Amino acid sequence: MKKAYKFRMYPNKKQQELINKTFGCCRFVYNKYLAKRIEVYKNNKETFTYKQCSSDLTNLKKELNWLKEPDKFSLQNALKDLENAYEKFFKEKTGFPKFKSKKTNRFSYKTNFTNGNIMYCGQHIKLPKLGMVKISDKQVPKGRILNATISKEPSGRYYVSLCCTDVDIEAFENTNN
């Protein structure tokens, strides 16, 4: 069973700057590859797959050094979000994927757990590229961490949500109502 734990974060100025850069880089990657997929389909009537986007992103990182600053998993997850948006468009007949705007009030990115790069340490949480970030909450995450989603609310507050697996969740009693 999976369970999510949400914590309020208190990043310092340097960490806030890196988080905001990561939001911008994820938006840039999503929009660039959405435009590229549209262009490739218009010109060749072919689809530009996630695998092609991912290998192209590696080349793009060599050209644009500022794309090396954020966490690599956040950029890959932006591509996965784009792939999921396309799959939903074709399978579930939802709307065509839209470009992400700077002017929205909510920003978020997701990063994956690998080799202990995300770790809960009491009043702090270790995140990739950010290091130790102060958090406030008394709950202790149980189970194995799968990923972390870093988000910023319109009020300017930062949050981190940990998705954990192998968590035992108590079943409610049947009230027969």
List each language-model region with its residue ranges.
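Nucleic-acid substrate recognition interfaces
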Residues: M1-N177
